[in-house]
Curated annotation (Swiss-Prot):
Organism of provenance: Shewanella oneidensis (strain ATCC 700550 / JCM 31522 / CIP 106686 / LMG 19005 / NCIMB 14063 / MR-1)
Listed NCBIfam families: PRK00124.1
Protein name: UPF0178 protein SO_2894
Lineage: Bacteria, Pseudomonadati, Pseudomonadota, Gammaproteobacteria, Alteromonadales
Transmembrane segments: none
InterPro entries reported for this sequence: UPF0178 (IPR003791)
Protein family (similarity comment): Belongs to the UPF0178 family.
HAMAP family reported for this sequence: UPF0178
Length: 151
């Protein structure tokens, strides 16, 4: 399992998703690293650690990009970060259970840029829905599929 690791873009990661990740790291004895610009509450575990980075735009993202490797999994809702880690041979999973891949990341980036253009022109696009029980279950299922492959 030494070649596998889970990275978390932790500043924006919902707490219920972190709890799922904590349990998975313990169950599988898999390294889990949460990267954030603030201290987080994490369980005492030899498998779970946190990296506190300085404040600033995309500082945590850059840390993850600099340290991620092939076969790692990154938990993030940040589509540009997902694109960067995919380029390095890692996988990216969002907190709703959607896996970003080489097959779908370009489309996701295009849609993100389009929505950003709409917002900057004054169109109100709204934010994402609150994390639902179905989202949590989808995330847990997607994580379990990845964990089954790394065993």
């Amino acid at each position: 399992m030494a070649n596998y690791k889970i990275w978390v873009d932790a500043d924006a990661c919902p707490n219920p998703i972190k709890e799922i990740l904590f349990r998975a790291a313990e169950r599988k004895a898999l390294p889990l690293v949460l990267v954030a610009n603030q201290m987080l509450r994490i369980p005492l575990s030899p498998f779970i650690s946190q990296i506190r980075v300085g404040s600033g735009f995309d500082v945590a993202d850059q840390y993850i990009v600099d340290h991620v490797a092939e076969n790692h999994l990154v938990i993030t809702a940040d589509i540009p970060l997902a694109a960067l880690v995919i380029e390095k041979g890692a996988l990216a999973l969002n907190p709703r259970g959607e896996l970003y891949t080489t097959d779908n990341i370009r489309q996701k980036l295009t849609m993100r840029d389009f929505m950003e253009d709409l917002r900057s022109s004054g169109v109100h696009t709204g934010g994402p829905d609150a994390l639902s029980a179905a989202d949590k279950q989808n995330f847990a299922n997607s994580l379990d599929k990845w964990l089954a492959r790394v065993k």
